[in-house]
Design a protein with these regions (language model features):
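Nudix hydrolase/Nudix homology domain
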Residues: 2-17, 97, 101, 107, ...
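Short, basic/aromatic recognition patches
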Residues: 9-25, 54-58
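Short, small/polar residue-rich loop motifs at catalytic or cofactor-binding pockets
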Residues: 28-30
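Generic short beta-strand
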Residues: 32-34, 71, 188
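Generic structural signal for well-ordered beta-strand positions
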Residues: 42-44, 82, 167
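Conserved Nudix-box catalytic region and its N-terminal flanking loop in Nudix hydrolases
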Residues: 49-72, 77-135
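A short coil-to-beta-strand element that immediately follows conserved catalytic motifs
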Residues: 137-149
Length: 253
């Protein structure tokens, strides 16, 4: 039997019209998210068209929560971070700057449900890097993603939409070919730490809430360690941070 939270989300379907949004972004709502509890235990699946209504601010407090990931790609030679600006067509957080790629593992793909060594979210990360940024999956081998932790956060996008996720943080150090999908990505650039801090201080630049939370509490410390732990060839290597992995679900506020 469906939980009260799921029933509430389904009931909301009648009240929101997706036809006013970009057709491709609306089509992607048919993908099935993985629903989890606050301990990141999978409890079912729901297509985004329904799951999206756990993103309605009216429903967020009713308990729907889903699994997500945030990938951070650093250039090996200089440790610069690849950022993207989300496309104007995005339903949530359009035009905001964020980390390299943020999305969801899907129940549609058996491999993306694999929880051993975070394989499912790593496979999903490689898939979405290609979809959003045109980075060939051959350039993002699953074994080179470094998992660091999971965060549980809640954030509004506007008066109607919000976000409520258990988000896996993945670092990757690779030279990649970027050919953005314009329906997903408006712009992209590589930045060093000082340039990113300057962006955060610029009131004209808007960021996604999860990126701001990760940067506030974790990113710059991890980044410092990444730069300190360069290999003998002078390049940064994500796996050098393996000892910093924290497998708790960290509740962010």
């Amino acid at each position: 039997m469906a939980s009260p939270a799921v029933l509430a989300a389904k009931a909301a379907l009648a009240s929101v019209d997706l036809s006013k949004y970009d057709p491709e972004q609306s089509r992607l709502m048919d993908e099935r998210c993985i629903l989890v509890d606050e301990n990141d235990i999978a409890i079912g699946a729901m297509d985004k068209k329904t799951c999206m209504y756990c993103h309605l601010m009216d429903n967020i407090n009713k308990g729907l929560l889903h699994r997500a990931f945030s990938v951070f790609i650093f250039r090996p030679s200089d440790g610069r971070l690849l950022l993207q600006q989300r496309a104007s067509e995005k339903i949530t957080f359009p035009d905001r700057w964020t980390n390299t790629c943020c999305s969801h593992p899907l129940d549609d793909f058996e491999a993306e449900k694999n929880e051993k060594d975070q394989l499912g979210v790593k496979i999903a990360g490689s898939r979405k890097l290609e979809h959003e940024l045109g980075i060939p999956q051959s350039q993002t081998p699953i074994g080179q993603f470094q998992y660091l932790t999971r965060i549980h956060y809640l954030a509004p996008s506007n008066d109607m939409w919000g976000e409520h996720e258990v988000d896996y943080i993945l670092f990757l150090t690779r030279d990649v070919t970027v050919e953005p999908n314009p329906n997903e990505v408006r712009a992209y650039k590589y930045v060093n730490k000082e340039e990113l801090k300057a962006m955060f201080e610029d009131p004209s630049i808007n960021f996604t809430p999860w990126f701001k939370l990760i940067a506030r509490d974790f990113l710059f410390g991890w980044w410092d360690e990444l730069l300190k732990r360069k290999g003998s060839d002078g390049q940064v290597v994500a796996q050098s941070l393996a000892d910093l992995m924290d497998d708790r679900v960290i509740k962010m506020a």
